[in-house]
């Protein structure tokens, strides 16, 4: 397919995958690196000597990146992981629970051509942390592998792409299945030229918005700049592993990322400067409309922006968002005071921190339309604004650059 620099371009690739049966495969997958705690990592290490956490997020003993590369090479040599003989795009059905309701999200694993944000083709919406990019770049240099996918969304309001995908896998058996806790995964490989061509042609009419994986995407751009000189236009280094999902998919869920603050003096002063406080009942949390809720010592207060609050430092595209107001008006001074700020998408876990004296800022989740509006305006939301649930596991579909 001729390359048009003004449209998104995806390509099939030969995935590296585990050869285990469904009853074992779930023990080998892990979450992406940025949601693995040290305790999670220890558990996953003990779960199997071949759990993908050893590659995705190795323990910091000695040279962790060399260790990850050595493990991956050894697994390939032993046949623990095998590369598919033919290139394909990979349909991934991910079933999970929201409360007691079972939900399915469908996405496509493919190779997505890299574009800088200013080209307006692959659109970021969130700022990143330099340290995380340094870590991912070191891993990419050592393994020469996209170990986990970026998560992108695209417009498909009329179901053109979703319908085409369904037709290609209808009545066929998945090539891989896995169960991880209450989540189920099924993967189909579409390797025929017509199926791949239909998906590429349909997606070429659309922008791709990065939902999750901004650090991995920027790392891939940095690696291309570092080592891509003289590479062919279709060289693997010019693409990144992506999991792409329709913005209208009923399984696309976005949670808020709440702020947990330890050290309250600067926070209280900032609140009183910019906001009015209104006590509310804890049971009303689920009904809260736009705003920020402060929780401390069992007390819940909803914040209302004062009429004379100066929002000139906040970009117009996102100054109405609670997360932007919290970051720009409240937490900037808190960080300068030396207080500790952590992030938690689970509301119950965030509230549990108040028992140890922390203050929690509960924030409303950002909807997909707002993300598109911010990205189309060329703006970036603060780090840790969104949490797309559930995460796409690492190890299910891996993309070597060799």
Outline where the language-model segments fall.
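Surface-exposed, charge/polar-rich loops and edge strands
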Residues: 1-402
């Amino acid at each position: 397919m001729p390359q048009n620099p003004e449209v998104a371009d995806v390509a099939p690739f030969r995935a590296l995958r585990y050869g285990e049966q469904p009853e074992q495969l779930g023990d080998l997958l892990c979450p992406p690196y940025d949601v693995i705690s040290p305790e999670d990592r220890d558990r996953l290490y003990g779960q199997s000597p071949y759990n993908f956490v050893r590659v995705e997020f190795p323990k910091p003993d000695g040279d962790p990146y060399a260790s990850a590369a050595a493990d991956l090479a050894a697994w390939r040599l032993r046949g623990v992981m095998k590369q598919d003989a033919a290139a394909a795009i990979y349909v991934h059905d991910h079933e999970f629970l929201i409360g007691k309701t079972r939900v399915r999200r469908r996405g496509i694993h493919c190779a997505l051509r890299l574009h800088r944000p200013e080209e307006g083709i692959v659109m970021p919406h969130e700022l990143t942390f330099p340290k995380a990019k340094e870590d991912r770049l070191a891993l990419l240099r050592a393994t020469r592998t996209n170990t986990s996918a970026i998560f992108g969304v695209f417009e498909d309001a009329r179901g053109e792409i979703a319908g085409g995908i369904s037709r290609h896998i209808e009545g066929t058996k998945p090539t891989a299945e896995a169960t991880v806790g209450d989540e189920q995964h099924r993967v189909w490989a579409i390797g025929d030229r017509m199926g791949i061509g239909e998906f590429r042609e349909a997606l070429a009419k659309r922008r791709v918005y990065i939902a999750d994986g901004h650090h991995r995407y920027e790392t891939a751009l940095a690696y291309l700049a570092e080592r891509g000189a003289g590479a062919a236009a279709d060289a693997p280094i010019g693409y990144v592993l992506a999991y792409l999902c329709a913005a209208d998919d009923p399984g696309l869920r976005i949670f808020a990322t709440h702020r947990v603050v330890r050290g309250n003096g600067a926070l209280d002063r900032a609140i009183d400067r910019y906001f009015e406080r209104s006590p509310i009942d804890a049971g009303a949390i689920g009904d809260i409309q736009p705003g920020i809720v402060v929780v401390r010592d069992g007390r819940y207060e909803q914040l209302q922006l004062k009429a004379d609050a100066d929002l000139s430092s906040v970009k117009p595209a996102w100054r109405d968002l609670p997360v932007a107001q919290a970051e720009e008006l409240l937490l900037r001074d808190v960080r300068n005071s030396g207080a500790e700020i952590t992030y938690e998408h689970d509301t119950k876990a965030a509230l549990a921190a108040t028992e140890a004296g922390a203050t929690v800022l509960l924030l409303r989740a950002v909807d997909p339309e707002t993300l598109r509006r911010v990205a189309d305006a060329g703006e970036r939301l603060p780090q840790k604004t969104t949490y797309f649930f559930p995460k796409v596991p690492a190890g299910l579909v891996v993309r070597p650059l060799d």
